[in-house]
């Protein structure tokens, strides 16, 4: 109405209609019509034809409604000229040094094989494994840990304890995060000396089946005092450090957060501050890559993240580092198209 009235009033009011012809909704329609296992070039051909049909249908409806526009010369994002112009524009951005390649964790749908925007994520209840894992303190840092807790020495092995509902992300662990301002206790127990947030310690010991009389607090300190103390990775031959991050909460868990920069935004942000690598062992199909280190109980390579969960639990149990394992029902992000659980994955 506005375009028509301004044109009739003598103004130059050109309207060039256009259509965004790309996106997962079109691919999803083709998948529903033709199945998931067709070749990529055929998918693109079918998507182009489907988009063209929709353009013509909508164009007829707009013309019938009396919309005044250049209907013989619309812009289409799938037009080869438009795509070529986009590449030229990106080339200019690249030449000016405004573009760089990096990794960042995003919502990832295993069925779409693609990243999802926040608006494409729905939350539904899901049952997940919830585990408490002990990270052994590196023997070369035992003295440093003792000093942090005001002790002259440790009487035995000590462990930083994390709680997670995504065991499959442990192969990508690069650190354990503590809150710099939280109070942490070193508690001697039959399972070793455990580092736990003071506010959560009682609930944790109860969860591990340790009687209150069996747990003796031998020292306390702020999380900041634990910064850069080295730990042994639970099942890989490498070390990870305790680092400080304000994303750590005392609402649940142990007050220490398993940190995998490839699989979480908070992990990525704190990891970037500490210069941690963003090592992503999971492919876009949700399966572990071929170079993923094997566990003593079996191979992770080629397994989906969901199939990896029980293997990781078996490995931790075999090494005596699984303090507690249970199932919980919680709200979890799902793909709005496939209604299937998604993951965070660096890409």
Predicted regions and their residues:
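Catalytic alpha/beta core of large soluble enzyme barrels
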Residues: 1, 12, 172-283, 317
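N-terminal, positively charged nucleic-acid-binding surface of large information/translation enzymes
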Residues: 1-191, 260-265, 270-273, 277-292, ...
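Extended hydrophobic/Leu-rich segments
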Residues: 145-146, 197, 230, 310
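Mg2+-dependent endonuclease catalytic cores in nucleic-acid-processing enzymes, primarily RNase H-like
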Residues: 290, 299, 313-314
């Amino acid at each position: 109405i506005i375009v028509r009235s301004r044109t009739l009033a003598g103004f130059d009011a050109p309207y060039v209609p256009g259509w965004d012809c790309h996106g997962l909704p079109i691919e999803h329609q083709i998948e529903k019509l033709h199945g998931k296992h067709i070749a990529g070039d055929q998918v693109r051909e079918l998507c182009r034809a489907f988009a063209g049909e929709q353009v013509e249908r909508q164009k007829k409806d707009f013309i019938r409604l009396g919309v005044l526009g250049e209907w013989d010369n619309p812009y289409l994002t799938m037009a080869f000229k438009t795509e070529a112009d986009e590449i030229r524009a990106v080339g200019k951005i690249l030449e000016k040094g405004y573009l760089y390649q990096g990794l960042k964790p995003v919502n990832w749908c295993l069925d779409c094989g693609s990243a999802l925007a926040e608006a494409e994520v729905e939350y539904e209840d899901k049952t997940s494994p919830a585990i408490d894992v002990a990270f052994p303190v590196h023997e070369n840092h035992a003295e440093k840990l003792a000093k942090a807790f005001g002790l002259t020495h440790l009487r035995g092995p000590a462990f930083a304890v994390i709680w997670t509902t995504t065991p499959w992300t442990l192969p990508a662990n690069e650190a354990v995060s503590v809150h710099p301002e939280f109070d942490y206790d070193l508690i001697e127990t039959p399972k070793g000396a455990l580092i736990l947030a003071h506010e959560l310690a009682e609930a944790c010991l109860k969860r591990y089946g340790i009687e209150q009389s069996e747990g003796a607090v031998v020292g306390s300190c702020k999380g900041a005092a634990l910064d850069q103390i080295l730990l042994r990775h639970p099942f890989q031959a490498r070390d990870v450090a305790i680092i400080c991050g304000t994303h750590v909460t005392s609402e649940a868990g142990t007050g220490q957060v398993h940190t995998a920069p490839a699989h979480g935004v908070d992990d990525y942000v704190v990891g970037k501050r500490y210069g941690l690598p963003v090592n992503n062992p999971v492919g876009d199909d949700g399966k572990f890559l071929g170079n993923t280190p094997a566990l003593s109980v079996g191979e992770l390579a080629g397994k989906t993240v969901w199939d990896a969960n029980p293997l990781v639990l078996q490995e931790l149990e075999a090494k005596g580092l699984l303090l507690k394992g249970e199932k919980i029902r919680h709200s979890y992000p799902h793909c709005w198209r496939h209604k299937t659980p998604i993951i965070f994955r660096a890409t």
